[in-house]
Amino acid sequence: MEGIEVVGEIKSKAVDPKGMAAVFSDRIFVKPTDPKWKEFPAVCMPKAFLGDFERTKNFKIYEDDVWLIGFPRSGTTLVQEMMWLMMNDYNYEGAKSVDTYNRAQWFDFFNVTHPIQGVDVGYQDRMPRPRIYKCHYPVQFLPDQIWTVKPKIVHIVRDLKDVAISYYYLRKNQWHEDIENIEDHFEDMFSAKTWYTPYREHIENYKRIPDYPNIFYMTYEGLMADKPNVTRKLAEFLGKPISDENLDQLLDHCKFEKMRGKLTS
């Protein structure tokens, strides 16, 4: 396939080869052929990514888009909710009545699962602006226009141990992958056999983006340790300074017990 080279594959052990578990556990190792990224190592990606690679690379980007990016299980769903409310005048009724993923699209998840779920993936293009996208892709597989249009990017990192444990329960309990135990998951993850690994390269490559003026770096631990201050900085970055009243309401809305059902990635 033009633009991408497949250098390895992991076959699914799922009972239903056409079910969701197979979508999640069928994996490939790929490298981009674009000279800009030729030095980057092979990355483990869902096999279904091949069918959406061209659309992803050619995806239309607007200057007022905002991309929230992080490795899976890094706190992106929490920050996604905060960002949507900041950018939509704290419309809590709208947040309650419309599913999170219809307000701020999980870009990579729908790209690889829409054939089975029947999701209208074209909705990603038609979302009302300003659009918010959550994405876990490694930097070399983002849409090409990101590097020319330069929309705002929020990048979040979480401690590797916590990510690895949380990722195990996601694979076991929600994706229903055929994993014997957490040790097998750790072996997969640390040998770069789970989605978007190798982990350290995923994180470090986003920190080395050259000449990118619109990126906000944050950590999950920093947010948990000082929610008011980090939230204010995020709001300032988005061009949405936050009042004390709105800050209190937002932090209450985003308490863990209230977000529990939404915290999927």
Regions found by a protein language model. Give the residues of each.
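Short, surface-exposed acidic
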Residues: 95, 239-249, 259
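PAPS-dependent sulfotransferase catalytic core
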Residues: 251-265
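Acidic, metal-coordinating catalytic cores used for nucleic-acid/nucleotide bond scission
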Residues: 223-226
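An alpha-helix initiation/capping motif
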Residues: 221, 248-251
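PAPS-dependent sulfotransferase catalytic domain
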Residues: 2-218, 228, 245
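Non-catalytic, well-ordered alpha-helical segments in soluble enzyme domains
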Residues: 89, 230-241
